Design a protein with these regions (language model features):
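C-terminal transmembrane helix and the adjacent membrane-cytosol boundary/short C-terminal tail
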Residues: 50-54, 58, 65, 92, ...
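Small-residue-rich transmembrane alpha-helical segments that form helix-helix packing/gating elements
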Residues: 3-18, 148, 152-155
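Interhelical loop and adjacent transmembrane-helix boundary motif
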Residues: 19-22, 105-153
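Transmembrane alpha-helices
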Residues: 3-6, 45-49, 53-56, 71-107
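Hydrophobic transmembrane alpha-helices
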Residues: 35-45, 95-99, 109-112, 151-155
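Alpha-helical transmembrane segments of polytopic integral membrane proteins
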Residues: 8-15, 42-46, 105, 158-159
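Loop-to-helix entry region at the N-terminal start of transmembrane alpha-helices
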Residues: 17-44
């Protein structure tokens, strides 16, 4: 739980000033939030992918070498295809984490409740919108926030179903 605040603090202290200095705009932008999310999801994707690659029997790699393939061809055409479903799982977990992330993004994204015109504008994510406004929302406003949550749920459901179909296709 505290990792999110650490990532958010890192974004505020390092990324926001960096964007300010490079682009000459307020550092709380969609670009800053995107870079921070990329930094946040990389450990998840790398960890799961590494486990999947290590789970591939070494005989795949060694057999490819024995047939005359180079190291690179053995890795890219024998080992990685065998680990594909695990790598896809890591990517899906990373995307799910990025979609559900609220607090670190709120800290660096500018929290502006309007449509951004570009990467250097502030933005408010759907999850942040729910968190910020649910406390005082009534009637139609509350229903709109619940609809936002349903949209997020459906989006994650579509990602998971797509992943399941890819895994099923991979096993066939």
């Amino acid at each position: 739980m505290y990792k999110r605040q650490v990532y958010g603090f890192f974004g505020l202290v390092v990324l926001v000033p960096l964007v300010q200095n490079i682009f000459g705009v307020a550092g709380n932008t969609m670009l800053t939030a995107s870079v921070l999310l990329g930094i946040m999801i990389l450990p998840t994707i790398i960890g799961v992918s590494e486990s999947a690659i290590r789970a591939v029997p070494t005989s795949y790699y060694e057999g490819s070498l024995a047939l005359g393939a180079s190291h690179e061809r053995s890795v890219f055409f024998a080992t990685l295809p065998a680990a594909r479903s695990g790598i896809l799982a890591g990517v899906v977990l990373g995307i799910g984490r990025a979609i559900g992330e609220t607090m670190a993004v709120v800290m660096v994204a500018g929290n502006k409740a309007r449509m951004p015109q570009g990467l250097l504008d502030g933005v408010r994510t759907m999850t942040a919108n729910i968190v910020m406004e649910m406390g005082y929302a009534t009637d139609l406003h509350r229903e709109a926030l619940i609809a936002t949550a349903v949209v997020l749920f459906v989006f994650i459901l579509i990602i998971n179903v797509t992943f399941s179909l890819l895994r099923r296709k991979d096993r066939a």
